[in-house]
């Protein structure tokens, strides 16, 4: 039985997400898989690539052949170089920058708010109306 490591497609119409699976070479693209060994989300920035290195090494050692897209993913993660014994086994996987925690964001916003000058909000239209009303009432009293 010829075994291949290939991608099965998941996700919506314009948002593809793939699973890296081990399956018989004769099965359909989204057909029955022997084992799921990772996932690949190409639309994220940077692309999410999670592959179980230990299982990939096992399947490659027993003769499973990766498809071309999967081989490119294995080269990025460094698993293909490790299997072939090539230099540069670290791969070129880009890692997403860590998001700041909500507590850190809150503390930064609080510190920025404390540094701002404290002054009451001024709405000249409302004050002008009050001043005009006060002036009219004093004029009316003076006229009487």
Swiss-Prot record:
An annotated Gene Ontology molecular function: structural constituent of ribosome
Ribosomal protein is among the record's keywords: yes
Keyword RNA-binding recorded: no
Record's keyword terms, sorted: Ribonucleoprotein, Ribosomal protein
Pfam families to which the protein is assigned, alphabetical: Ribosomal_S16
Region described as Disordered: 115-144
Biological processes per GO annotation: translation
Cellular component terms per the entry's GO annotation: cytoplasm; small ribosomal subunit
Family of the protein in this entry: Belongs to the bacterial ribosomal protein bS16 family.
Protein name: Small ribosomal subunit protein bS16
């Amino acid at each position: 039985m010829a075994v291949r490591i290939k991608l099965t497609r998941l996700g919506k119409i314009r948002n593809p997400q793939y699973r890296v699976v081990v399956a018989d070479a004769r099965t359909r693209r989204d057909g029955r898989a022997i084992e799921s060994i990772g996932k690949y989300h190409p639309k994220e920035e940077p692309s999410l690539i999670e592959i179980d290195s230990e299982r990939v090494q096992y399947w490659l050692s027993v003769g499973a052949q990766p498809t071309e897209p999967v081989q490119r993913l294995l080269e990025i993660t460094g698993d293909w170089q490790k299997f072939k014994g090539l230099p540069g086994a670290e791969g070129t996987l880009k890692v997403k920058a860590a998001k700041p925690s909500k507590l850190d964001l809150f503390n930064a916003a609080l510190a920025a708010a404390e540094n701002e000058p404290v002054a009451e909000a001024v709405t000249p239209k409302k004050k002008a109306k009050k001043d005009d009303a006060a002036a009219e009432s004093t004029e009316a009293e003076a006229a009487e």
